[in-house]
A protein has these predicted regions:
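Exported/periplasmic ABC-transporter solute-binding proteins
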Residues: 1-28, 33-44, 50-63, 67-220
Length: 220
């Protein structure tokens, strides 16, 4: 099936792995919420791959996409610049005065997941140290890697892409949100057969192995 005709809107955290799975489509990466808004406004996308399930489910409820399918999972991790100027060694250090915390905005999947983690850890007050609310996870990654923030929450898969520039601090399993990625074919697509074939490809062993190699978790 020829996939070069496809335009795929995908979560920023899929920037590296999707072209490795299939380099032929045209990809547009960004915050899942912003991409969904573009589809609602009539942008010519064939597929939406979101870093959560709620955004595509909302589009499905509105009749804009076919039934979303879960295709992978992820986890959150805290990153700090390699030099760690704020001397952050635990997530609990984020509540200290003067810490510059960079996060994604509410409504962006990783931003919502970040707030769940902080709440689960009893660290809602750390949000007082937020210096910027970004539009997607790659913006958080860049700010911390460049030393413009003392810490930020990203997906574990994103942290792997800037090894050597950041250090990571794990988050205990009990505080982790359920991070599931769902993909859906846009009903107005002019390439429905190719779009459905791409979704099928994501579920097959070769694509799943590439997702695992990039640090993503099995879909079930």
């Amino acid at each position: 099936m020829i996939t070069s005709v496809l335009t795929i809107f995908a979560a920023a955290s899929l920037t590296n792995v999707f072209p490795a799975i299939d380099s032929h489509p045209t990809y547009s990466f960004g915050g899942s919420n912003a991409l969904a808004a573009q589809i609602q406004q009539g942008a010519p996308a064939d597929i939406l791959a979101s870093a959560n399930t709620s955004i595509p489910e909302k589009l499905y409820g509105a009749g804009l996409v076919e039934k979303p399918i879960l295709f992978t999972r992820n986890e959150l991790i805290l990153i700090v610049p390699r030099s760690n100027p704020a001397h952050i060694h635990s997530v609990f250090d984020l509540r200290r005065n003067g810490v510059k915390l960079d996060v994604a905005a509410p409504g962006v999947p990783v931003g919502d997941y970040t707030r769940i983690v902080l709440h689960n850890l009893g660290l809602d007050d750390a949000l007082q140290n937020v210096v910027s609310n970004e539009t997607d996870v790659r913006d958080v990654l860049a700010k911390v890697a460049l030393g413009e923030a003392d810490a930020g929450f990203v997906y574990t898969t994103d942290a792997r892409t800037v090894r050597g520039k950041v250090a990571t601090i794990g988050i205990r399993w009990s505080a982790q949100p359920i991070v599931q990625y769902a993909v859906a074919v846009v009903k107005s697509s002019k390439h429905l057969t190719a779009a459905r074939a791409y979704v099928t490809k994501l579920l097959r062993p070769i694509a799943q192995r590439k997702l695992r190699a990039a640090g993503f978790l099995p879909r079930k």
